Amino acid sequence: MSILTDEKLLADVAAGMSGHAIAKKYGMTPGNINRRIKRLGARGLGHGGNVSRFVPDGYKVKGTSSLVKPDGSVALQWVKTDVDAERQLKMMQEAIAALTECLSPLEEINLISRDEDTTLLNMYTVTDAHIGMLACEEEGGDDYDTNIAEHLISSWFKSATTLAPNATECLINLQGDFLHFDGLKAVTPTSGHILDSDTRFFKVVQTAIRVIKRAVNMCLEKHRKVTLLIATGNHDLASAVWLREMFKEVYCDNPRVTIVDEQSPYYAIEFGKVMIGVHHGHCSRMEKLDAVFASKFREIYGRTKFGYLHMGHYHHRKVAESNMFITEMHQTLAAKDEYSSNGGYDSGRSATVITYHRDYGEIGRISIPVEMIKDWYGLE
């Protein structure tokens, strides 16, 4: 039995033989034949090879459909393409290599604060920022878009780091739904509900990265140790993941910055005798959170005396105390979109920095309302 070369295989395919027929002819399995035909097609050979030059880079010819005249000539031809995963991976690697050529290391941020208190930790909580959301004053009482969100959140961090005590440590608690939508379509990731958006997704990504980096830099000037927690919300299920991974790489060589690396939507921080738990609020109800955290983080719960749980999701403030934890639901800085306005969901707008003592638990807080930020920084 003769050896099946690429030339023979191409000739048999051109003659109209099926994969099964070719396999029988050469004593091979049909799967083997089909894999070889696909590999040849990926190289622009065989069926559709004469049109492969018209296919964009990153794609390959999957097949062609031809309208043949009675005399055997081709009147029309349709080219069917598919993603060339190997080529697209190579293209992405080339793009990454090109981008990294012009990257320079982050400038070192020096600690400006003096007389720091090693017994304190400041927690800066911003929940439900919804960067990329569109809201208008006529409908919900105030305007909100990506540009407003960036200035509002950045100004809040500037105010909060100025007013808060000089604690040695801080926790930046971005408590979920930092981005309003999670991809190219402005819809919720799981239910597909249409969302009010004001811009393209790449601009939302750029803004989110700038805001987080700016917040970390401000905190590095004030605190010796900065912990960044990017919680997963129901609006940014995927984005929270890549944001965490990206900032892990950005600050991997900075011993003063720690990124909370937890893939479940429940997060716990231990500070002396204090346990701080964070969950966006989309997976567990408020009244259930204490049992979830006591079970999930048994060791931390057993070692600590004071327990505080924090959530968002509902955009209004509520506090409940059980035998195990004090659970707090936080307000948001974002304005009301059409959904919230039409549903009658009305609440105050603020964000809070809470100060914890490692031996005594919460000892102070500063709540900064949106109106105060607008007045201080001339925001409209």
Residue ranges and their predicted role:
Residues 1-146, 162-166:
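Acidic, histidine-bearing metal-coordination/catalytic regions of metal-dependent phosphoesterases
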Residues 50, 220, 246-256, 261-265, ...:
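Conserved beta-sheet core of the metallophosphoesterase superfamily
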Residues 59-72, 213-230, 277, 307-310:
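N-terminal short leaders/motifs
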Residues 75, 239-241, 268-272:
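Short, solvent-exposed polar/charged micro-motifs at secondary-structure junctions
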Residues 103-114, 156, 289-300:
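Short, motif-level signal for alpha-helix interfacial/capping segments enriched in acidic residues
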Residues 108-129, 137, 142-257:
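Core catalytic region of metal-dependent phosphoesterases/phosphodiesterases
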